[in-house]
From Swiss-Prot:
Region described as Basic motif: 1-13
UniProt xrefs under InterPro entries: bHLH_dom (IPR011598), bHLH_NPAS4 (IPR056192), PAS (IPR000014), PAS-like_dom_sf (IPR035965)
Induction context: Expression is regulated by neuronal activity.
Span of domain bHLH: 1-53
Expression across tissues: Brain-specific.
Compartments, record wording: Nucleus
Polar residues: compositionally biased ranges: 361-398
Name of the featured protein: Neuronal PAS domain-containing protein 4A
Domain PAC: 295-334
Positions of the UniProt region annotated as Helix-loop-helix motif: 14-53
GO molecular function: DNA-binding transcription factor activity, RNA polymerase II-specific; protein dimerization activity; RNA polymerase II cis-regulatory region sequence-specific DNA binding; RNA polymerase II transcription regulatory region sequence-specific DNA binding
Region (Disordered): 361-451, 514-573, 750-776
Length: 933
């Protein structure tokens, strides 16, 4: 059975291989190519030639008469014509299946058609993967009478798809659709849904190297000019400033201008005004050192009859007196749409890969102008004019500019954006861009006036923030201070020049509801033209120190409805004056400011390459946080969510503070410590005092002080919970000090209204003397104040560490009570905590003692020695708790008054965990405590 099955399989394979060999003999290729084909290669070529034969035979059969067939070229004539073409011919269907690939492809791509189509019969197998979308979008069936398409594509120059090391070559493709109408073909025909495209491909890169000889350059130009067979073209030579020197005589046919007229004027004088920026940017990229020496542009050129002709120019930088050689292709508006959109998308992708920002003006120029109409949905851009993701940089310069010092002058020129080697200006525009023209101050900016000298003594008292953030770099400091690099301030110019200057597009999310960048609030603006105007209301010419008001972070604001912050304008008649040293923070008053950290420049860890990182943050002792409002929001909060810390971890933790706030906080802490020390001394009196106090006074302490209970407000209802704060205090003022003082006053009044300490009468027959000093007693911390929330108790200062040891040696008398007190005290609104000393692991081997119950009530804490068989006290009887346990339990909540912040390198959320103080053992003789370990 197995032998027969194995033999049948082998017989079938032999039969299939024989048929494939028969197909190889039928292929119209040379015997040398046939001998090196594999079975898969044979099948791929057979499919391609079969599709071509079916398509052309269908065209011949649909001819109405024999006279029409005689008008076609014969096979040999067509073959000679194709071989004489400058490029190569490509026929393919709408889905990318190849029908024909001329043999002349080997002259341009370096490999024959058999080598390129060996492992696939699709055009996507021989082009670069980055251009698959471009090819697919241009093979969409046309929806307009114009069936011509012009686009660029990179073809692989390797034999196999698996070998990509050989690179690729850029080819200009002009495609024409040969689709048939439904009446000419059957409704279910394959060619109805897959129209055939004939593509004339002309390589845009020359065959010779960049530094070839003159004869090689002439042969290269001659071969390039032959591409006008399917695309009108003329060749021209230019100097480094793009002034034309030589041009082909056919330029008079396309432009109506002879070579002498073109030679007498600059090339930029013939360009459309809307295309000047795009042309100058490509010109600069061509002359950039270290570049590839090649550039492309799509511009409109004025003809002799004052009309506009679209030119697709491919510029190549070579050596010699006229180093720039340009092949100029005359294209239509539809083709200009396609090529220009393709250039724009490629430049955007390149800028994202290289991490450099593209020019805003260039992105506008790369979009189609308003005069063009979209001929096809394929070439319709997403939006006309500025895109929705553009940023408004009319108020601040975020680009990394380079200042140049010319002629030993001390004046600083405005920053030039390095979209090319230096800027996006042409060589002629650079000569007149910074010239002073008083008659047109807004149309052409003038040179910046000499800066005001500022010495070190003048700014010695300014803090780090002022010197590095608010002091503009145009001010010369002698000797210079070690400040961070800053961009030059914005120059008020025309809209076209503003978009040319402020071109940095940061990789961040713009503010909600607007296109303003969060770092765009200016502090200084300069008017280099010298034209002065009275500043509007709210603007000053003096650098003043302001403090932003405190706003609730939970209330989201609308950036659109808020007015812009007042800026400081500096002109020649309004000199900059530095005020006296102060401790205020130099920030503008903003009605919708949520946190100062949102307005700071990005840090080195921020996403992006650093083009928009105008400076680095000063070293801050503490974690950085972003203020994020609580509660659900219908949209993300305004400002920037930086990756330094998660905004959900800790809300609203500012880290900049002034020296005055620090001193005020220290004073409040010291006063609070004194008050609590005085309060603690009232709790811990001498144990013998209870014997001297008359027992009749204890009757007043049996009922809680209801008046004091009512006098304490429920502060937790109107004052939010305070979270931990860093070492640096907030610059916004709050009612924290008032709140702490009110709590202290309430507690002091409550204590003053309570009677003196007295032993609680229980049962005279069951009274027992105090326990021996050798018997240890456990102090168990518990926390509850009737009528006072945990927030109020959390404002105690952490002085218990110093006061506990002082009071521990004085001894205390605890009251062991029955376990039934728990239910009674719970009914009274108290939260007791029971601790059995015998069951505690800390007291193994120590004589046990009755269980203790410690509670705290609004009345005065009383220490009462009671024997173990005591009847349950009344619900209103208060049980005492020492201040030691209260303060020990309140220690984790002490963050509102004290400045306890995590150190460098520690996680901030660890300081939000509540620390549990271990139980401590004290002896009545005051000998101290035994360590639990």
């Amino acid at each position: 059975m197995y032998r027969s099955t194995k033999g049948a399989s082998k017989a079938r394979r032999d039969q299939i291989n024989a048929e494939i060999r028969n197909l190889k003999d039928l292929l119209p290729i040379s015997d040398a190519d046939k001998s090196r084909l594999s079975y898969l290669h044979i099948m791929s070529l057979a499919c391609m030639y079969t599709r071509k034969s079916v398509f052309f035979s269908q065209d011949i059969t649909t001819a109405s008469s024999a006279e029409e067939t005689t008008g076609f070229l014969s096979f040999y004539e067509l073959n000679e014509l194709i071989q004489g073409m400058p490029g190569f011919l490509l026929l393919l269907t709408g889905e990318g299946k190849l029908l024909y690939l001329s043999d002349s492809v080997s002259d341009h791509l370096g490999h024959s058609m058999v080598d390129l189509v060996a492992q696939g019969d699709s055009v996507y197998d021989i082009i670069d993967t980055a251009d698959h979308f471009i090819m697919r979008s241009n093979l969409v069936p046309p929806t307009s009478p114009d069936t011509d398409r012009l686009f660029r594509c990179r073809f692989n120059t390797s034999k196999s798809v698996r070998r990509q090391s050989a690179g690729n070559k850029l080819v200009l493709i002009r495609a024409r659709c040969l689709s048939q109408t439904p009446s000419e073909s059957s409704p279910g025909s394959y060619w109805t849904s897959n129209p055939v495209w004939v593509c004339f491909c002309a390589p845009l890169e020359p065959h010779t190297s960049r530094g070839g000889t003159a004869s090689d350059r002439e042969s290269t130009s001659a071969s390039a000019l032959e591409s006008s067979f399917f695309l009108p073209c003329f060749r021209s030579q230019h100097s480094r400033d793009m002034r034309l020197h030589e041009a082909q005589e056919s330029v008079s046919v396309y432009l109506g201008l002879n070579v002498e007229i073109l030679r007498s004027q600059s090339w930029y004088s013939f360009l459309h005004p809307q295309d000047l920026s795009h042309a100058s940017a490509q010109h600069c990229s061509l002359l950039r050192e270290g570049g590839e020496g090649r550039a492309e542009m799509v511009v409109r050129v004025e003809t002799a009859d004052h009309s506009w002709v679209w030119l697709y120019m491919v510029l190549q930088l070579e050596t010699g007196e006229t180093p720039i050689v340009s092949n100029n292709y005359i294209i239509s508006e539809t083709e200009a749409w396609s090529v220009r959109q393709q250039l724009s998308s490629e430049q955007t992708q390149l800028s994202l890969v290289l991490g450099s920002s593209t020019s805003q003006q260039e992105s506008v120029s790369l979009q189609s102008p308003e005069t063009l109409s979209s001929p096809d949905q394929v070439f319709t851009p997403g939006s006309s004019g500025l895109s929705g993701q553009s940023f408004d940089f009319s108020t601040a310069a975020c680009s990394t500019g380079s200042t140049e010092e010319q002629g030993g002058s001390s004046s600083m020129e405005p920053a030039q954006v390095e979209s090319g080697p230096r800027s996006s200006l042409s060589s002629m525009e650079e000569e007149t861009f910074f010239q002073h023209e008083p008659s047109e101050p807004m149309a052409s900016p003038s040179s910046a006036s000499s800066p005001i000298p500022v010495t070190v003594a003048t700014v010695s008292d300014l803090d780090f923030l002022t010197q590095n953030i608010l002091l503009p770099p145009a001010f010369q400091i002698d000797p210079p201070l070690p400040v961070l690099p800053l961009p030059l301030p914005p120059v008020p110019t025309s809209q076209a020049q503003q978009t040319k200057e402020f071109v940095c597009t940061p990789p961040y999310t713009p503010q909600l509801g607007g296109s303003n960048f969060p770092f765009g609030e200016p502090h200084f603006s300069f008017d280099p033209t010298g034209a002065t105007s009275p500043p509007p209301l709210g603007q000053t010419a003096t650098v003043t120190t302001t403090t932003a008001p405190s706003l609730s972070p939970s209330a989201p604001s609308n950036p659109q409805s808020s007015p812009p912050p007042p800026t400081t304008t500096l002109s020649s008649l309004l000199p900059l004056t530095i005020t006296s040293p102060t401790t205020e923070i130099l920030f503008p008053v903003e009605p919708c400011s949520g946190s100062l950290y949102e307005k700071l420049p990005p840090t080195p860890d921020s996403p992006g390459d650093g083009d928009c990182t105008v400076m680095t943050l000063p070293e801050v002792r503490g974690p950085l946080y972003v203020d994020v409002p609580h509660g659900p929001l219908p949209y993300p909060p305004e400002g920037l969510l930086t990756p330094e810390a998660s905004p959900g971890k800790q809300p609203s933790l500012p880290f900049f503070s002034s020296l005055r706030d620090r001193e005020k906080e220290r004073t409040e802490i010291s006063l609070l410590a004194q008050h609590i020390s005085t309060l603690a001394e009232g709790f811990y009196l001498d144990p013998l005092l209870a014997k001297l106090v008359p027992s009749t006074l204890s009757e007043h302490s049996q009922s809680p002080d209801s008046d004091g209970l009512d006098s304490i407000p429920l502060l937790g209802e109107f004052y939010p919970l305070k979270s931990w704060k860093g070492l640096d205090l907030p610059i916004f003022q709050d009612d924290e000090s008032l709140f702490e003082e009110s709590v202290l006053e309430t507690l002091l009044q409550d204590l003053s209204s309570s009677p003196p300490l007295s032993p609680t009468p229980s049962s005279s027959s069951h009274s027992s003397p105090p326990s021996s000093p050798s018997t240890p007693e456990c102090w168990c911390p518990s926390l509850h104040f009737d009528g006072v929330s945990a927030v109020s108790a959390g404002h105690f200062c952490s002085v218990q560490s110093a006061h506990c040891n002082n009071e521990a040696g004085r001894g205390a008398m605890m009251s062991p009570v029955n376990a039934g007190n728990m239910t009674d005290t719970k009914a009274a609104g108290e939260v007791p905590m029971e601790t059995d000393v015998a069951s505690s692991p800390l007291f193994t081997g120590i004589p046990t003692s009755p269980p203790l119950q410690l509670t705290a009530s609004p009345a005065s804490p009383i220490l009462m020695p009671v024997s173990s068989p005591v009847s349950p006290p009344s619900p209103g009887l208060p049980c005492a708790q020492s201040l030691l346990e209260e303060l020990a339990a309140l220690e984790p909540m002490f963050g509102a008054g004290a400045s306890i912040a995590p150190g460098l390198g520690q996680q901030p959320e660890l300081y939000q965990l509540q620390s549990h103080v271990p139980q401590q053992c004290f002896r009545k003789d005051g000998s101290g405590s035994d360590p639990p370990f």
